[in-house]
Amino acid sequence: ETGFWLESDRMLSLDFNPRSLEVQRQVVIEEFKQRNLNQPYGDASHLLRELAYESHPYRWPTIGKEIAHIAQATLEEVKDFFFRFYAPNNAILAVTGHISFEETIRLAEKWFGPIPARNISPRQLPAEKPQTAVRRKTVERKVPVDAIYMAFHMSNRMHPDYYVYDMITDILSNGRSSRFIQLLVQEQKLFTSIDAYISGSLDEGLLHVTGKPVEGVSLEQAEEAIWKELEKMKTVPVSEQELEKVKNRYESEQIFNNINYLNVATNLAFFELLGHAEDINLEVGKYRSVTVGQIQDTACRTFVPENCNILYYKAIK
């Protein structure tokens, strides 16, 4: 019950004053420095977002694009944001553990029921226009080695293609026997590390490929090697065995993931945000339904230069 009380108190009567704002401002600024300025490659995601998105707010990192954005936030702006969104009628509560449904409802009504609803404005975000040409950016930083970042526009979280994209990235880089690891790291020895993953964004997201080439391999050579493997996804159908392997891995990961109470609560809340919490039970089936033909068709539509954003992150010698 303490958790219900703490969260309801925060929602109802959060204390806004200049002193507390300044304390939290400094905390966030230090977090920005630690994650984005002082950490090697820390600003790469910021640079790639700005490159890939021209109109959608995804181009803005949640923490802010630069320290000035944090430093210049006023008390009135913070209060206005809070009172626009933090309300019971705009919140999802997920509770897991040794507690009954009836007790959960009782506590929710006790602590959140008296909090007045607020007028929540509809979510209206500008749509990102289709990309029509490759976008490139090169930066130099004090980092150990060069790195390449590539981002391709992909579907939103609710689109059926989302599951296809997730399977594609698993085929490319999930596990020692994946294509990138086996071919580009172990056999050709072009990369010390390489990864492919999707953003999982509610709106149209990004499929990322990131890698660090070995010493002596240029970023141009690294990019060429990546494109070669992506072309294979387009021209040579994935084998049923390879696809079944990543499906089995996903299903086993979901089973282990749901052992943890916090993971279960987080996932239930997320699927309720998407529309229905019970849809979480359909996920494995949706992944299982992905076909070889869908993999190839989606790869052909996605892995083209005009849909790609490329960041060369060069180490200052």
Positions of the model-derived regions?
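Charge-rich, well-structured scaffold segments of protease-associated domains
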Residues: 1-120, 138, 156, 187-317
